Design a protein with these regions (language model features):
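Conserved small/polar residues in nucleotide/adenosyl-binding loops
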Residues: 158-165
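Short, hydrophobic/amphipathic alpha-helical patches that form generic packing surfaces
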Residues: 145-156
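Short Gly/Pro-enriched loop/turn and capping motifs at secondary-structure junctions
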Residues: 59, 156-157
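A general structural signal for well-ordered alpha-helical packing
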Residues: 76, 116-119, 147
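Active-site histidine-anchored catalytic micro-motif
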Residues: 2-101
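Aromatic-acidic/polar surface patches that form glycan- and anion
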Residues: 29, 140-143
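Active-site rim beta-loop-alpha module in soluble metabolic enzymes
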Residues: 85-141
Length: 167
């Protein structure tokens, strides 16, 4: 559509999907599906040439509103209605991918100013009491959320191309 973002990420997705490369293209999507949907709208022929690993959707099978879906529900519909192979990781699954706060204190906080800053940002967001409406931060653990996509990337390939884009 005319309102599809014109950005580096969309162009990169299209170029990578159209590459003459026997290795499969896995896209570990984090956040909204806006750029993926825009690439599919611009070049629908890329759908069969990629697999999207996506953290999104409420608990299976009932579902409910979920942050990554709510950011751009139309883009989610474009993705799910396409021929793209989607490995969906719903909230009840990705919420189990946790790291302890003590491990973050041990491995992140001592990493200079950036590590101390990141650790403090997590602590500032950490609730002082359990909230059953927000199960992502409970007890002494922090759910890593969207990072679950990296954990399920196939590791059997000898090369993986990584590229970060921002729209």
């Amino acid at each position: 559509p005319e309102d599809a973002p014109d950005c580096e990420a969309v162009e990169f997705l299209i170029q990578e999907a159209l590459r003459d490369d026997p290795a499969p293209l896995y896209i570990a999507a984090q956040g909204a599906m806006t750029n993926i949907a825009a690439a599919l709208n611009r070049a629908p022929e890329i759908a069969s040439r990629m697999t999207v690993l996506w953290n999104g959707g409420g608990p299976y099978p009932a579902g409910r509103p979920e942050f990554n879906v709510q950011q751009d529900p139309i883009a989610c519909r474009v993705l799910l209605d396409s021929a793209v192979t989607v490995w969906q990781i719903p909230q009840d699954v990705y919420a189990k991918f946790e790291v302890s706060l003590s491990e973050l204190a041990l491995r992140v906080r001592p990493c200079g100013e950036v590590g101390a800053y990141l650790f403090q940002q997590l602590m500032d967001e950490y609730p002082s009491e359990y909230d059953p409406r927000f199960p992502l931060r409970t007890g002494g653990n922090w759910t890593l959320g969207d990072n679950t996509t990296a954990a399920v990337l196939p590791v059997s390939y000898t090369h993986l191309r990584a590229h970060e884009t921002r729209s």
